[in-house]
């Protein structure tokens, strides 16, 4: 698999998703992914830090450009704990846990991202506070998003060989048939 192509596909996907999601600075963006799936293998069987770099670098660039916080989900071996910047942990009141991700407990994407963060901390969960997210390889990130999740259909549905699912969230609409709502 060509790493430049993976990076290009990731850049296209993240830019399109962030344009559609229209997040405010300081919002939490959730990333979950499997480099094994990107390579066409079963999740957890062919991790690659090189593939992780090709995915994480363009995502971090897009996230930083918009003033967002990135939360990177780990694998089931660390109970799907997430990597965030310490500033995001403090802002959102998240519970820190003690684990350092590596390729076989956390996964390649989280491991590479951990090395790139300025002040990385691991948190147990996001308390359902994520504003939008990207799932690369069907690793299931929905548990970290706010209650009203809106699927986002992108022009591309794969990165490498991995199926992707993108989502944004919106506030709950309350009040019934006589209520009026802001256009979202």
Swiss-Prot record:
It comes from the Bacteria. Signal peptide: none annotated. Belongs to the UPF0340 family. This is UPF0340 protein TTE0860. It comes from Caldanaerobacter subterraneus subsp. tengcongensis (strain DSM 15242 / JCM 11007 / NBRC 100824 / MB4) (Thermoanaerobacter tengcongensis).
């Amino acid at each position: 698999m060509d790493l430049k192509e993976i990076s290009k596909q990731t850049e296209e996907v993240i830019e399109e998703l962030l344009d559609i999601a229209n997040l405010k600075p300081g919002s939490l963006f959730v990333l979950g992914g499997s480099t094994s799936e990107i390579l066409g293998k079963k999740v957890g069987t062919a991790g690659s830090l090189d593939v992780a770099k090709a995915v994480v670098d363009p995502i971090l660039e897009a996230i930083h450009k918009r003033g967002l916080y990135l939360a990177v989900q780990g694998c089931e071996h660390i109970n799907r704990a997430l990597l965030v910047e310490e500033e995001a942990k403090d802002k959102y009141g998240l519970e820190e846990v003690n684990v350092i991700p590596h390729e076989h407990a956390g996964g390649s994407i989280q491991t590479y991202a951990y090395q790139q963060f300025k002040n990385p901390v691991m948190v147990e969960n996001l308390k359902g506070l994520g504003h939008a997210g990207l799932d690369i390889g069907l690793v299931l990130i929905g548990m970290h998003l706010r209650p009203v999740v809106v699927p986002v259909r992108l022009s591309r549905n794969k990165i490498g060989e991995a199926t992707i699912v993108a989502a944004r969230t919106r506030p709950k609409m309350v009040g019934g048939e006589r209520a009026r709502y802001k256009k979202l």
